[in-house]
């Protein structure tokens, strides 16, 4: 897409999220296996070209030393690539692997993890509250000059991008790649009931860990146990990924995405038959939600199409047609119906965020108001 369009979409999305959500939190409130921070706290802006970045990572080929590891006992191997490590902004290592669950730290006794360790590399993080990833210790030792503890990381899973931090290392024998905290793993794959002894086995997850001191989440947003300001995590993540996208020339035919984020207006559609400001997302393109479509197009039956009655939406990426696991994943008055954000005139309000209809539960006490726990989900 043209640079102005990318900048406008990204800037507006950040402005909406930053002012409307304000995720400064008391981490202990979310230190629960089924009550961690909701996905919206650490999901990338919908303006980030997630699919294009994932495709670029799949083409990476530069292999540094100490970079190849199995993804499990006796399994295939994954290689950490350094194609992006030399950029002046948005520098990062990347790799593709599966996703096992790491509960080291505060929650070392999580389900399926009887032998967890009480500490993580730079503290004792809560695996229930902090979305973090794990890197093999040998690779960390070989790259201590660039890989920093608590550096921002991005994970692409199930077609979505989530931000976290590089919070722990793997010193097992053999050392493996493809490991993330309880929160990150269960956010990526909410229907798989992942735990310390059950991981996502397909090697289809893209991991990106940013390098250098400027990529480290500051102490104002993090303590030894919890992330305390998710706004900072999201803002840094979008900025770093925006810089990476620019370096990879992923802005589309008209230019590159910006490295600095400023508030600008979304340009009006150019009008006319066949006009479209976001190449690849025009009428007829495949889509999963309205946010996959350019300008005023909407996602109808999996295809971007014109719809003069398109509704407004204050939370980009969570509009009508977006995938969801609970009502809290949907904007405004939309409800999560059969995994899709949809209009429901009978939607009831929910006062306990993360415990609304569709949320995971183990008992009725995990559900808001008059909802009940049925088959592991809060239901009316």
Curated annotation (Swiss-Prot):
Q: What Pfam families does the annotation carry?
A: Glyco_hydro_75 (PF07335)
Q: Where is the signal peptide?
A: 1-22
Query: Could you say which EC number(s) this protein's record lists?
Result: 3.2.1.132
Q: Which UniProt keywords apply?
A: Carbohydrate metabolism, Glycosidase, Hydrolase, Polysaccharide degradation, Repeat, Secreted, Signal
Thermal behaviour (record text): Optimum temperature is 50 degrees Celsius.
Question: What are its GO cellular component terms?
Answer: extracellular region
Q: From which domain of life does this come?
A: Eukaryota
Per UniProt, what is one GO molecular function of this protein?
Answer: chitosanase activity
Q: Which reaction does it catalyse?
A: Endohydrolysis of beta-(1->4)-linkages between D-glucosamine residues in a partly acetylated chitosan
Instruction: Write down the top EC class of this protein.
Output: hydrolase
Query: Where are the annotated R repeats, by residue?
Result: 276-304, 311-341, 348-378
Noted pH dependence of activity:
Optimum pH is 5.5.
Main localisation, per the record?
secreted
> What Gene Ontology terms for biological process does this UniProt record contain?
polysaccharide catabolic process
What does its UniProt record remark on the domains? The C-terminal R3 domain contains 3 tandem repeats required for the binding to insoluble chitosan.
- Which family does the record claim for this protein? Belongs to the glycosyl hydrolase 75 family.
- Function comment: Chitosanase catalyzing the endo-type cleavage of chitosan, the deacylated form of chitin. Chitosanase may be crucial in the degradation of the deacetylated portion of chitin in the fungal cell wall. Chitoolisaccharides produced by the hydrolysis of partially N-acetylated chitosan are known to have many biological activities, including antibacterial activity, immune-enhancing effects, and elicitor activity.
Know the name of this protein?
Answer: Endo-chitosanase C
Q: Which organism is it from?
A: Aspergillus oryzae
Chain's gene name? csnC
